[in-house]
Amino acid sequence: MATVVIKIGGSTLEALEEGFYEGVVKRASLGDKIMIVHGGGPAINNLLQAMAVESQFVNGLRKTTAEVLTAAETALSGQINKQLVRSLYQAGGKAIGLSGSDGHLLKTIPIDTDKLGFVGAVESVNVDVLFNVAKAGYIPVIAPIGMDANYQPYNINADTAAAAVAKASKAEELVFVTDVDGVQKDGKVIKEMDEVLAKHYIEEGVIYGGMVPKVNACLDSLSGALTKARIVNGKKAYHPSAGTAIVKQSNVLTSGA
């Protein structure tokens, strides 16, 4: 029985097929502890547009004013979180939607208030909340809105939140759900590669464009008990060996598809 953290990006949500949710539910039914962390950038953008509020990005992070924070919390903890919960139920599973503020799940500290406003980094994770939810037979679905020691909410990058949850829960695997089949070389999906090979492929340009930050997020997550990160296509049925696995140990001799 493994603990698996699945990160679903906001831009991927609308493309997820029913088969993906069914695969997640099946894996949970076989005994794995599944924890989901999600983003919601497009939903936040739509809400900000409706509110006539402009936002900007600094080094890839959304600068979060008080107005932007309200939109982010509404879209993430409300709309997107509950959409995912409903989809898991429709696939035959059981899920509970949580914000990082619930149970002080994601204790947060500001990154740089002057430059980023209410954007936070995860200081600690209350894993007891997650394990209690999982023990009761539910899949926790986490919106990345954290809270500091003074109960101020913060917007957290979903990749960062997922990595923090994976590390704190001592997960064996972290899965990044995207809209592609995995990392490709010569038109074929690479089934598995280690850290050294992944960095080499980035340097050589085999891994390029939008895949680079995804692979870097996988590399950054490989710490502690986490020995494997995986990139999968959310448009297809999810199963444990799908996509590309990036592993900690240098045991991969080839990049064979």
Swiss-Prot record:
Q: Which CDD domains match?
A: AAK_NAGK-like
Task: Give the range the annotation lists for the signal sequence.
Answer: none
Which GO terms are recorded in the biological process aspect for this UniProt protein?
Answer: arginine biosynthetic process via ornithine; L-arginine biosynthetic process
Where along the sequence does the record put site: Transition state stabilizer?
7, 214
Claim: Nucleus is one of the keywords in the record: no
Q: Which residues bind substrate?
A: 40-41, 62, 155
UniProt KW keywords:
Amino-acid biosynthesis, Arginine biosynthesis, ATP-binding, Cytoplasm, Kinase, Nucleotide-binding, Transferase
Describe the task this protein carries out: Catalyzes the ATP-dependent phosphorylation of N-acetyl-L-glutamate.
Report what the protein is called.
Acetylglutamate kinase
